[in-house]
């Protein structure tokens, strides 16, 4: 419970809310939340999907007062008490948060009033999700126009690790929950496009707030295509990336294979096992993941080459399950890199020949970036 002297005001400062990453108690219906939400948002709806649809139909046919009356009849008694209790607990757990609905209107106001009747004063976001969303898109467009450098290199070069290690790095693949290749999906589902964009804006705002400690800051991003799995990059960011200088990481095949072995065969198998609990189910899901990654590019490989690699993959999977040994995967992964992924990336890199600013191994690129782009004051 907050006393009047401690009451926090409602906020219309969407930029500050996104930058700070405050918790939002989002009272929109689940279907709205699934289409797009802000980082830190918790969906505790005033109305479920069916209730919202019924109230919306009533509003169109009979007007606002009739729709409001229907809403109160639908969210009544035990249903109302259960939702109030969920909001109360969320307010206690997140005392610095805000209520949020679609436009900062009736739904967040009703929840705020109901909470106030229980002695809980909790502020709302004026303008709601719509204002936050617009601020997020504007921020991404604005910040995307700042200087940047891309990290390029063949699969397994350690590009993502470099991005994550640098103070101005934005991990686009991490935000998208996808690593960009046919084997790129993770166990975390990809976000809706709007949610991906909102998380990207929040990451850029949060990182940019720390740029004052750097003498010559640039964004550091992995050299991506326009799509990362099902998510596409915002247009302005994509346009700037197409013109940005590129630092190319050149690592020997053996080192790349070791990175990929750890990430795709050791860590992914453990992740499937942890997620599913049952050992047999974990192995089936992990096997399906590897099978699908290779199957997705079968036409580009050619069916004969695909069949050859698939047989090697199956043998490596059987060996891994039997002995725990993962190096057998190199029998299909090495030719896949050398015959498919590497030529494809080199072809793309040739188009950017004039943009290449530096070449070196992982540690050389790291040192070059830190010296030229991320030097501390």
From Swiss-Prot:
Its EC number is 2.9.1.3. GO terms for molecular function: transferase activity, transferring alkyl or aryl (other than methyl) groups; tRNA 2-selenouridine synthase activity. Gene3D superfamilies: Rhodanese-like domain. The active site is at residue 101. InterPro entries: P-loop_NTPase, Rhodanese-like_dom, Rhodanese-like_dom_sf, SelU. Keywords: Selenium, Transferase. It comes from the Bacteria. Residues 18-141 form the Rhodanese domain. SUPFAM superfamilies: P-loop containing nucleoside triphosphate hydrolases, Rhodanese/Cell cycle control phosphatase. It is an enzyme of class 2 (transferase). GO terms for biological process: tRNA wobble uridine modification. The keyword Endoplasmic reticulum does not apply. It catalyses: 5-methylaminomethyl-2-thiouridine(34) in tRNA + selenophosphate + (2E)-geranyl diphosphate + H2O + H(+) = 5-methylaminomethyl-2-selenouridine(34) in tRNA + (2E)-thiogeraniol + phosphate + diphosphate; 5-methylaminomethyl-2-thiouridine(34) in tRNA + (2E)-geranyl diphosphate = 5-methylaminomethyl-S-(2E)-geranyl-thiouridine(34) in tRNA + diphosphate; 5-methylaminomethyl-S-(2E)-geranyl-thiouridine(34) in tRNA + selenophosphate + H(+) = 5-methylaminomethyl-2-(Se-phospho)selenouridine(34) in tRNA + (2E)-thiogeraniol; 5-methylaminomethyl-2-(Se-phospho)selenouridine(34) in tRNA + H2O = 5-methylaminomethyl-2-selenouridine(34) in tRNA + phosphate. HAMAP family: tRNA_sel_U_synth. Monomer. NCBIfam families: PRK11784.1-1, PRK11784.1-3, tRNA_sel_U_synt. Belongs to the SelU family. Involved in the post-transcriptional modification of the uridine at the wobble position (U34) of tRNA(Lys), tRNA(Glu) and tRNA(Gln). Catalyzes the conversion of 2-thiouridine (S2U-RNA) to 2-selenouridine (Se2U-RNA). Acts in a two-step process involving geranylation of 2-thiouridine (S2U) to S-geranyl-2-thiouridine (geS2U) and subsequent selenation of the latter derivative to 2-selenouridine (Se2U) in the tRNA chain. This is tRNA 2-selenouridine synthase. It comes from Cronobacter sakazakii (strain ATCC BAA-894). The lineage of its organism: Bacteria, Pseudomonadati, Pseudomonadota, Gammaproteobacteria, Enterobacterales. The gene is selU.
């Amino acid at each position: 419970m907050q006393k009047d002297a401690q009451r926090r005001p409602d906020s219309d400062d969407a930029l500050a809310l996104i930058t700070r990453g405050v918790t939002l108690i989002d009272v929109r219906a689940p279907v709205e939340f699934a289409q797009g939400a802000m980082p830190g948002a918790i969906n505790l709806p005033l109305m479920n999907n069916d209730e919202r649809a019924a109230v919306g139909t009533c509003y169109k046919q009979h007007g606002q007062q009739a729709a409001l009356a229907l809403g109160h009849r639908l969210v009544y008694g035990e249903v109302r008490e259960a939702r109030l209790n969920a909001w109360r607990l969320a307010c206690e757990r997140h005392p610095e948060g805000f209520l949020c609905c679609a436009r900062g209107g009736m739904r967040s106001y009703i929840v705020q009033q109901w909470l106030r009747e229980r002695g809980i004063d909790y502020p709302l976001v004026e303008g709601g999700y719509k204002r936050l969303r617009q601020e997020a898109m504007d921020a991404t467009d604005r910040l995307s126009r700042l200087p940047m450098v891309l990290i390029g290199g063949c699969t397994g070069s350690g590009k993502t690790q470099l991005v994550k290690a640098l103070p101005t790095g934005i991990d686009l693949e991490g935000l998208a929950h996808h690593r960009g290749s046919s084997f790129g999906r993770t166990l975390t589902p990809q976000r809706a496009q709007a949610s991906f964009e909102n998380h990207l804006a929040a990451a850029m705002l949060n990182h940019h707030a720390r740029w004052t400690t750097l003498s010559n800051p640039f964004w550091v991003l992995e050299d991506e295509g326009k799509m990362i799995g099902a998510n596409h990059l915002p247009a302005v960011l994509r346009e700037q990336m197409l013109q940005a200088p590129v630092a190319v990481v050149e690592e020997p095949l053996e080192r790349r294979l070791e990175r990929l072995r750890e990430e795709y065969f050791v860590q992914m198998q453990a992740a499937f096992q942890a997620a599913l609990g049952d050992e047999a189910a974990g192995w089936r899901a992990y096997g399906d993941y590897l099978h699908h990654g290779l199957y997705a590019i079968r036409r580009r490989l050619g069916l004969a080459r695909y069949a050859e690699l698939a047989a090697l993959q199956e043998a490596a999977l059987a060996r891994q399950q039997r002995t725990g040994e993962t190096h057998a995967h190199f029998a299909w992964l090495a030719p896949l890199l050398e015959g498919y992924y590497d030529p494809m990336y080199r072809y793309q890199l040739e188009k950017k020949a004039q943009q290449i600013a530096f070449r070196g191994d992982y540690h050389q690129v790291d040192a070059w970036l830190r010296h030229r782009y991320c030097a501390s004051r």
